[in-house]
Every structure is written in C-alpha cells, then in structure tokens.
Design a protein with these regions (language model features):
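Conserved nucleotide-sugar donor-binding catalytic segment
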Residues: 130-186
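Acidic helix N-cap motif at the loop->helix transition within catalytic regions
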Residues: 17-20, 45-53
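Short aromatic/hydrophobic "clamp" motif used to bind/position activated sugar donors
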Residues: 84
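A conserved acidic beta->alpha catalytic loop
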Residues: 32, 40-49, 88
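Conserved donor NDP-sugar-binding/catalytic core segment of glycosyltransferases
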Residues: 96-128
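Glycine-rich, basic loop-to-helix element that forms the pyrophosphate-binding segment
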Residues: 62-79
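Cell-envelope/extracellular polymer assembly enzymes that use nucleotide-activated donors
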Residues: 4-7, 35, 176
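N-proximal low-complexity "stem/linker" segments adjacent to membrane-targeting elements
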Residues: 1-28
Length: 186
C-alpha cells in the first residue's frame, strides 16, 4: 500500500464539544492524500462515537494515556504518511485548500519541515488576531531563542526525522520537539 503524503493526527480527551469543528475542517480539505488518525485518551463523553462517524477518519484509538505528549507519541508511532500534521481537538485548518497549498510547497522544494502562521479565531471562526509570536521568514534552531515561534499545528514535519516527544517535559515537550526536529532537518 502506498504511503499517504500526510498523517493528520488529532489528540482528544473528552472533546465532544470541540472535535466536530476539527473534523469538519479536515473533511472540507480539497487535498485528500492523507490518513487521519484520532488518538483518544479513553474519553467518556461521546468523543469516540463522534470521531467514528466522520468519513475522513482512517483510525480511532481510544485507551488511557499519560497525557497529551504520550498520546502524540502514540500517533507518531501509528503514522504512515510522509509528513506529520498535528491538529488537535479544537484546532482547524484555515481554509479548505490548506493541505493543497502545503502539498504544492512540498512538491516544489522537498523540505523536511514546512511551517506557517497561526490565526486565532472565535467559536464562530471569526478572525480575532494573528498569534502574538510570529514565525520568521527563515526558521532555524536559533529562532527558538525567542520562544515558541511556530505553533505545532503549523509545523509540518517529515515523519522520518520526527523524534518522539520527551515525556519528561510536562508542559513544553512540543517546544523541545520542534527544536529537535529542526536539528534533524536538512
């Protein structure tokens, strides 16, 4: 079986209220060369049933975990795609052609990492503002001295270079993960 270009990974835990918007944003994508993995931490609020009813979802795993980053590692291990996209419950792609634009960029430059900006929106998807920390024109390991300049939702990584999240970091394992990905990138 041929590998999909993207593995979209959504982490959930009792996310019945926020998951539907995330699912809709994936279902609306015009680019469909992806697998969509839901990794759930044994929700009790109907999250799993909601995920299972989405035609876009390839796989739903629901079992206890040790928190967000443990669940993200489970998604990493299960992913088959060439690139990883973490889009957690409550997150959404900006436009229906977001994956297409990323795929076009990948086709032109064959990068290890693709990154972008993050827009903050309200529950009705109305624009609030751009994220306070903006991504630089050219991202490097040194860029992270200024903080987490790129949200992990806007940080798409070639699966082969992606390490697992370090579970010693309870709150900022994504910051550490992005730096380690940058160190592995060509």
């Amino acid at each position: 079986m041929e590998r999909p270009l993207f593995s979209i990974i959504t982490i959930t835990f009792n996310a019945a209220g926020t998951l539907p918007a995330t699912l809709r944003s994936v279902e609306r994508q015009t680019f469909t060369d992806y697998e969509y993995l839901i990794v759930d931490g044994a929700s009790t609020d109907g999250t799993v049933a909601i995920a299972q009813h989405s035609a876009a979802v390839s796989s739903v795993t629901s079992e206890p975990d040790k928190g967000l980053y443990d669940a993200m590692n489970k998604g990493l291990r299960k992913a088959r795609g060439c690139y990883l996209v973490f889009l957690n419950a409550g997150d959404a792609f900006h436009e229906p052609d977001t994956l297409q634009k990323i795929a076009d960029s990948i086709e032109k430059t064959d990068p290890d990492i693709v990154y972008g900006e993050t827009a903050l929106v309200d529950s009705e998807r109305r624009f609030i503002s751009m994220r306070r920390l903006q991504a630089p024109e050219r991202l490097s390991v040194k860029s992270f001295r200024m903080g987490m300049l790129v949200c992990h939702q806007a940080f798409i990584v070639r699966r082969e270079i992606a390490p697992e999240y370090d579970l010693r970091y309870r709150f900022s394992a994504d910051f550490d993960w992005c730096i380690r990905c940058m160190q592995m990138a060509k």
